Swiss-Prot record:
PTM description: Autophosphorylated.
Keyword tags: ATP-binding, Cell membrane, Glycoprotein, Kinase, Leucine-rich repeat, Membrane, Nucleotide-binding, Receptor, Repeat, Serine/threonine-protein kinase, Signal, Stress response, Transferase, Transmembrane, Transmembrane helix
LRR repeats: 75-98, 99-122, 124-146, 147-170, 171-194, 196-218, 219-242, 243-265, 266-289, 290-312, 314-337, 338-361, 362-385, 387-408, 409-433, 435-457, 458-480, 481-505, 507-529, 531-554
Keyword Plastid: no
Membrane topology (Cytoplasmic): 610-980
An annotated GO BP: positive regulation of response to water deprivation
Family per record: Belongs to the protein kinase superfamily. Ser/Thr protein kinase family.
Residues that span the membrane, as ranges: 589-609
Native source species: Oryza sativa subsp. japonica (Rice)
Name of the featured protein: LRR receptor-like serine/threonine-protein kinase SIK1
GO terms of molecular function: ATP binding; protein serine kinase activity; receptor serine/threonine kinase binding; transmembrane receptor protein serine/threonine kinase activity
Phenotypic effect of disruption: Normal growth, but increased number of stomata in adaxial and abaxial leaf epidermis. Increased sensitivity to salt and drought stresses.
Gene3D superfamilies: Phosphorylase Kinase, domain 1, Ribonuclease Inhibitor, Transferase(Phosphotransferase) domain 1
């Protein structure tokens, strides 16, 4: 009987196994064609996936598709990483068919539409990041079905509606980041009963209601950020029970009342309460919060004195108390805060003197005491704060003189002593603070002459000495202020004539000299200040005629009022005669002008004739008595040309051949006899050292050849002017294309990356392969020229000193451009190869953002650092990059590289060889020797939870090559302000 049943049992087993195999093959159990079809459904929702997901072609092996990670046994899709691919369209409901999905990262795209309800069908999901898109609508309640979910990141979208209270039903949720959306309503109280929640980010929404006492129920919550909402009420008295908090930010809401005393029981590293309506005094107990690194109570309505016990906060680096109604004196005990780098007490009602104890703060970077009622002198030992970068005491009642020791503050870039009662002479030592970009001494009682040494501040952007009692002339040395944009010395007693050297200020926007005693004529050279938009010379004793240059016609009559001997030419009816200026010229005067012009023309023609006559050499000298300059030829394409040929081909350097201006030169285009075009650079100033030494340097530079360097073809040095002959670049400079007024050519991502690679390779050659090695010293976007194929060529390295083959490669020759200069230069006054690396990092930021290095008061590097601190760097990407880049992960890596290049300490920066190699690794696979691959299984395995990410930004570097990966590991993650 048993033997008879055996065949039937065998057939039953075969049928069961067959059905199971069939189900597995159809996708019912995990992988297979079912999930492949689901992925194709997901792709169909994306509007522009053709390029980014080119391998998503419906083929059999969906596990090999870009961004897809599968289980090795069942082939079920476990992870989907399509971040930073510039994807548009919507998230398809088909994603809900991927039942085994554990990891979804779609951040940094341009996805629109609503989050599909079907996302709740991905029941195995542990990590969901949809941040940095354009998603709108409500947060779907179906997300609460994801019982395995640990991290939910939806920040930086356009989501609306309330926060679903059902999110509290996700038992394993550790990270909830909904920042920078448009969410409304109260914060659900049930959220605070999730026992495992560690990170709650709700900043930048429109949430209302109050702070719930239940917020302290979360024993594991370390990050609580509700900054920038519409919360009201008071800070809960139970706030002291939030003992797990490390970051507490409730700033920029409408919180009122007093700061609870038991807030001192917190052990937070950051306590940020600014921008609310808090009243009362600062609790003394805050001075016991030893873990504080940042204390921000600014922009409230706090009263009373600053507690002296705050001096016990020995680990606090930032103390912001500005914008309150604080009274009393500045506690001397603040000098004990040895780690303090930012101290802002401005806009209060403080009295007394500036305590000398502040001079002990060796790490102090910014000191702002403006708009108080402080009296007395500036303590001399403030000059001991050698790291000080900004010092502002505007709007007090300080007196005395400027301490001579200020010259020790080599890092100082901003000095504002305006609207006080300072007296005496302006010390000439201020000219030694070589990194100053703003000097404001206005509205004081300074007297005596203006120090000529101020002309040494070559990085100065704004100079304001108005409303004092200064006398003497305007120093001719001001012509050296090549970066200056504003000069205001109005309402003084200045005398003498205007120096013609002011005409060298190519960046000057405003020149304000009204209400002085200036005499003489307005120098015609001022017409060379092509950036000048605001000119006021009224109420002086100027004479002669206003220059008739085109750019002077834009200035109104009011610019020249109160100069009885000054003739102003009216060019339209708008100037009128109502102001009493002389506008009529007699016939006799006209005849004299014409006669004088004829005589001048004759003298000029005679001088030209004599100049062109050959002159004998002076015995024993290599210089002719007079005659045309010699042309030194360094490349064969100029071998048949003479100096006279160049002058003839450019019509004596006629304006119509000008193709650009610089701070120290004008550039002309010249077409040689062969038809080849070259660029002729005419230097404004003569070489100050041995002419033969300069020739030797130029001959050395002319011998350097590299595909990414602009070649020097020849030069001509003489009292007539120094001319340098370079390659002509059809597409001008990178600065012109990024920031110029026309911007005719849009630079896509691939072009920008190739430009960065080319410039890096050129600079790497100068640093490492050139003999002698050369430090450029002025790397900037205007010194990166582009040929007809947009290949980058580094120019102006000829002005650098050659580095000898010794162990030290530093030099003391001062060069650089504001915005690009290494901060370390402020401390040491020395530049080296790593200074060039810093400048290149700024150029790379320009390429990525399309923004200028310095624009008015905005500093690109500081902007990116602040965004790095908020983990919003990708918001700064230029729109043309976003549109044309198919893998935004490459852009993030480029940002990382730029921030590595601009680290504060030179030893932490890479070399240019390393920079060039990493940039090469970012080029498209077709340009690489080996194709790039991305190991997403490694990413999935190493996904870091929020609890492990404190203070760090998790970014997948990819697996470009082992050496590149080691390089990134060597220098570490950089999207953290503490590592800059």
């Amino acid at each position: 009987m048993a033997a008879a049943r055996a065949p039937w049992l065998w057939w039953w087993v075969v049928v069961v196994v067959g059905v199971a195999v069939a189900e597995a093959a159809s996708g019912g159990g995990g992988g297979g064609d079912g999930e492949g079809k689901a992925l194709m459904g997901v792709k169909a929702g994306f509007g522009n996936a053709a390029n980014a997901l080119v391998d998503w072609d419906g083929g059999a092996d969906h596990c090999a598709w870009r961004g897809v990670t599968c289980d090795n046994a069942s082939f079920a899709v476990l992870a989907l990483n399509l971040s930073n691919l510039n994807l548009g369209g919507e998230i398809s409901p088909a994603i809900g068919e991927l039942k085994n999905l554990q990891f979804v990262d779609l951040k940094g795209n341009k996805l629109t539409g609503q989050i599909p309800d079907e996302i709740g069908d991905c029941i195995s999901l542990k990590y969901l990041d949809l941040s940095g898109n354009l998603l709108y609508g409500d947060i779907p309640f179906s997300i609460s079905k994801l019982k395995q979910l640990e991290e939910l990141i939806l920040k930086n979208n356009q989501l609306t509606g309330p926060i679903p209270s059902t999110l509290s039903q996700i038992p394993n949720l550790k990270t909830l980041d909904l920042a920078q959306n448009q969410l409304t309503g109260d914060i659900p109280r049930l959220i605070y009963w999730n026992e495992v929640l560690q990170y709650l980010g709700l900043r930048g929404n429109s949430l209302t209601g109050t702070l719930s006492p239940d917020m302290c129920q979360l024993t594991g919550l370390w990050y609580f950020d509700v900054r920038g909402n519409n919360l009201t009420g008071t800070i809960p008295e139970s706030i002291g029970n939030c003992t797990s908090f490390e970051i507490l930010d409730i700033s920029y809401n409408q919180i009122s009342g007093e700061i609870p005393y038991n807030i001192g029981f917190l052990q937070v590293a950051t306590l940020s309460l600014q921008g609310n309506r808090l009243t009362g005094k600062i609790p003394d107990v805050i001075g016991l919060m030893q873990a504080l690194a940042v204390l921000d109570l600014s922009e409230n309505e706090l009263v009373g004195p600053i507690p002296s016990i705050l001096g016990n906060l020995s680990y606090t680096g930032k103390l912001y108390l500005h914008g309150n109604k604080l009274t009393g004196v500045i506690p001397p005990e603040l000098g004990n805060m040895s780690k303090l780098s930012y101290l802002q007490l401005n806009d209060n009602e403080l009295v007394g003197t500036i305590p000398a104890e502040l001079g002990k703060l060796e790490e102090l970077f910014e000191l702002n005491l403006a708009n108080n009622n402080l009296q007395g002198p500036i303590p001399a030992n403030i000059s001991s704060c050698t790291a000080l970068n900004k010092f502002n005491v505007y709007g007090n009642k300080l007196n005395g003189s400027i301490p001579a020791g200020f010259q020790k503050l080599e890092s100082l870039t901003y000095l504002n002593l305006s609207s006080n009662n300072f007296k005496g002479n302006i010390p000439s030592e201020l000219g030694h603070i070589i990194n100053l970009d703003t000097l404001d001494l206005s509205y004081n009682e300074f007297s005596g002459p203006v120090p000529a040494t101020i002309g040494d501040l070559e990085h100065l952007l704004e100079l304001n000495l108005s409303k004092n009692h200064l006398d003497g002339p305007v120093p001719a040395e001001f012509g050296n202020l090549r970066s200056v944009q504003v000069i205001d010395m109005s309402n003084n007693n200045l005398s003498g004539s205007l120096p013609e050297e002011l005409g060298q200020l190519q960046n000057l926007d405003s020149l304000i000299l009204n209400n002085n005693n200036l005499v003489g004529e307005i120098p015609a050279q001022l017409a060379n200040c092509f950036s000048l938009n605001n000119l006021n010379l009224s109420y002086n004793n100027l004479s002669g005629h206003v220059p008739m240059a085109k750019n002077f016609s834009k200035f109104p009559m009011e610019s020249f009022l109160g100069n009885p001997l000054l003739h102003v030419y009216c060019q339209d009816s708008s100037c009128g005669h109502s102001h009493g200026q002389r506008v009529n010229i007699s016939k006799t005067a006209i005849a004299c002008i014409i006669l004088g012009f004829i005589i001048l023309l004759c003298v000029l023609l005679l001088a030209i004739y004599k100049t062109n006559q050959p002159q004998p050499l002076v015995k024993g000298s290599d210089k002719p008595v007079q005659g045309p300059p010699k042309l030194v030829v360094l490349q064969m394409d100029m071998a048949i040309h003479t100096y006279e040929d160049i002058m003839r081909l450019t019509e004596n350097l006629s304006e119509k051949y000008i193709i650009g201006y610089g701070a120290s030169s004008t550039v002309y285009k010249c077409e040689l006899k062969s038809g080849k075009a070259i660029a002729v650079k005419r230097l404004y100033s003569q070489y100050n050292h041995s002419l033969r030494e300069f020739e030797t340097e130029l001959e050395t530079i002319g011998s350097i050849r590299h595909r990414n360097l602009v070649s020097l073809h020849g030069f001509s040095l003489s009292p007539h002017g120094n001319l340098l002959f370079y390659d002509y670049m059809e597409n001008g400079s990178l600065w012109d294309l990024l920031h110029g007024p026309s911007k005719k050519v849009k630079l896509n991502w691939d072009t920008r990356l190739r430009i960065a690679v080319g410039a890096a390779q050129g600079l790497a050659y100068l640093h490492h392969d050139c003999n002698p090695r050369i430090i450029h010293r002025d790397v900037k976007s205007s010194n990166i020229l582009l040929d007809e194929n947009f290949e980058a060529h580094l120019s102006d390295f000829g002005i650098a000193k050659c580095v000898p083959s010794a162990k030290s490669h530093a030099s003391t020759y001062v060069l650089g451009t504001i915005g690009y200069i290494d901060p370390e230069y402020a401390r040491t006054s020395r530049l080296n190869e790593k200074s060039d690396v810093y400048s290149f990092g700024i150029v790379l930021l320009e390429l990525l953002t399309g923004k200028k290095a310095v624009d008015n008061e905005s500093n690109l590097h500081q902007l990116i650092l602040s965004k790095a601190d908020d983990n919003t760097v990708m918001e700064a990407v230029d729109s043309e990059v976003s549109v044309t880049c198919t893998d935004m992960g490459l852009v993030r890596k480029a940002f990382q590289l730029a921030l590595l290049c601009t680290k504060r300490h030179p030893s932490d920066r890479p070399t240019m060889h390393e920079v060039a190699r990493v940039l090469l690794s970012l080029l498209p696979a077709s340009a690489m020797t080996t194709p790039k691959t991305v190991d997403y299984s490694r990413l999935l395995a190493s996904t870091t939870t929020a609890a492990d990410m404190r203070g760090h930004d998790v970014t997948d570097i990819g697996d470009n090559s082992s050496s590149d990966e080691q390089w990134f590991v060597r220098f570490g993650e950089v999207i953290s302000k503490h590592t800059m």
